[in-house]
Structures are given as C-alpha cells and as structure tokens.
Amino acid sequence: MMNSPIQAVIFDWAGTIVDFGSFAPTSIFVEAFKQGFDFEISLAEAREPMGLGKWQHIEAVGKLPTVAQRWQKQFGRPMQASDIDAIYAAFMPLQIAKVADHAAPIPHSLEVVEQIRSRGIKIGSCSGYPRQVMDVLIAAAADYGYRPDYVVATDDLAQGGRPAPFMALKNVIELGVTDVRACVKVDDALPGIEEGHNAGMWTVGLLLSGNEAGLTLEEYQHADDQTLQAARERAQAKLQQAKPHYLIDTVADLPAVLAQIEQRLLAGERP
C-alpha cells in the first residue's frame, strides 16, 4: 500500500482514544470541588469547558452563571485564584490515583492506530491533563497496547495549552512533520478542535465517544437508535461551534475520513 500524503494524526486522549465518555476528569472535578470547599457541582457543569488545561477548566466552571451564583451565595464573594489553586490541589492527587482506572482503549481505537501506522503516518498526541497525570496514564495505556509516538501534556509548554496551537505544533516539531497541512487533529472537545484549526491542520470531532455525549461505554453499546441520535445531536450542537472539517461517531470511523483527506491533499486542497 502506498504511503499516505498525511504525515501525522494527533489524537487527544480521554474521550478520544481511551476513557469512553471522558469520565475520569469529570467525576474528579465534582469530587475536587466537594473536597476543597464542600461545594456541589453537577457532572454537566463539570463537563462544560472540557478540553482546557485543568486549572483553566476549574476557572471556567467557576465562571458558569449557575456555579458563580451558588458560589456567591455560599461564600459571599466570587471565586478567586486562590480558590482555584485549592480546588486544583485537591484535584491532582485524586486524578493521579484514579486516571489508570480509565485507561482502557475506546473500542477499535488500537486497530485504527495500527492501520494508520501501517501507512507510514506518525501518531502524535496531546491532552488537557498535566504531566503528573499523563505519566500515569501513558504507562497504563501502554499496558493495553497504546503507545503514541509523542505525547504533550497541558503544562509541558510555557506558552500554554488549548485552544492555542502550541501542543499540536510541538507534536509537529518532535515528529519531524514538514507541513502542518499534512496533519489531522482528532478530538472530542471544542478547545481541541480549535487547537487543530489554530495549528493549520485538518480537524475531526468525535460525537459519541467523548465529553459532549457523556455516555458510558455500556450505555453506548446498549442504546437504541433514538438515544444515540439524541446524543449525537447534543454533541454536534457544541462541536459545530468550532467548525471541524469532519464529525464522526468514534475513532472507529476515522479511516474513511482519512481516505477523504488524502484525496483532498492529493488534489491540492488545504485545511
């Protein structure tokens, strides 16, 4: 089989390749708010800004009108940076302790990765997780057989994380990619798709395996068509804001999209 005009596919982690439904970070955000301040947030509120670095994520949750109102009522003042620091301090050990429990690959992701590699395409990756958490997740995912060629954590770069392009571009540099147009960014969350656009890459959003659908693997596997379509539409309404080039259900559907991108590249198109 001929080598591909695509040089690299850069995957997000939770909700994209591992952790169907992206439950590791969301459930722990709820727990960290509870542990840090005895303050309740819902899973839906925890999911809202998913894809950002985790400190920025806590800050964004605090700015949600529903959360800000309850915080003001409970504490008599708005959330401030020292509060975010305290919640983040509670978040980190919880996440480090539990992230390995959510390292199982999303169905068909390993086969898709191997299929992509067989075409001579590099496998990059980046995450909203900080390095301390990623080191645990990388090892756990490797035990399942997932070993990307490069990994960038959200706090690796002084310039910052998503939605800026820096983590994606760090993959470009380290993987020796010669043209960002030959890269595809795959993500289940809005900031990750925006990151791909900002890096000049093709972007693919995932509707059913990630944060926006919020389905467990079991719910997904046993859902009827109506339930799946409702989840699909819910995720699409959010992800479409970033105007991804493609929207698919899960990484299992990625090979067909990559074939289309290859044809577009060969025809001289750019993202």
From Swiss-Prot:
SUPFAM superfamilies membership: HAD-like
Cofactor note (record): Binds 1 Mg(2+) ion per subunit.
Subunit-structure text: Homodimer.
CC terms in the record's Gene Ontology section: cytosol
UniProt KW keywords: Hydrolase, Magnesium, Metal-binding, Schiff base
Catalytic function, reaction form: phosphonoacetaldehyde + H2O = acetaldehyde + phosphate + H(+)
Domain of life (superkingdom): Bacteria
Residues making up the signal peptide according to the UniProt record: none
InterPro entries hit by this protein: HAD-like_hydrolase_sf (IPR050155), HAD-like_sf (IPR036412), HAD-SF_hydro_IA (IPR006439), HAD_sf (IPR023214), PGP-like_dom2 (IPR023198), Phosphonoacetald_hydro (IPR006323)
PANTHER family noted in UniProt: PHOSPHOGLYCOLATE PHOSPHATASE, PHOSPHONOACETALDEHYDE HYDROLASE
Gene (UniProt): phnX
Species the sequence originates in: Vibrio cholerae serotype O1 (strain ATCC 39315 / El Tor Inaba N16961)
Record-stated family: Belongs to the HAD-like hydrolase superfamily. PhnX family.
Binding site for Mg(2+): 12, 14, 188
Pfam families: Hydrolase (PF00702)
One GO term of the biological process aspect: DNA repair
Active site, per annotation: 12, 54
Enzyme Commission designation: 3.11.1.1
Lineage of the species this protein comes from: Bacteria, Pseudomonadati, Pseudomonadota, Gammaproteobacteria, Vibrionales
Chain's role: Involved in phosphonate degradation.
CDD domains documented for this protein: HAD_PHN (cd02586)
Coiled coil: none
Protein name in UniProt: Phosphonoacetaldehyde hydrolase
Recorded GO MF terms: magnesium ion binding; phosphoglycolate phosphatase activity; phosphonoacetaldehyde hydrolase activity
Keyword Flavoprotein among record annotations: no
Cofactor(s) of this protein: Mg(2+)
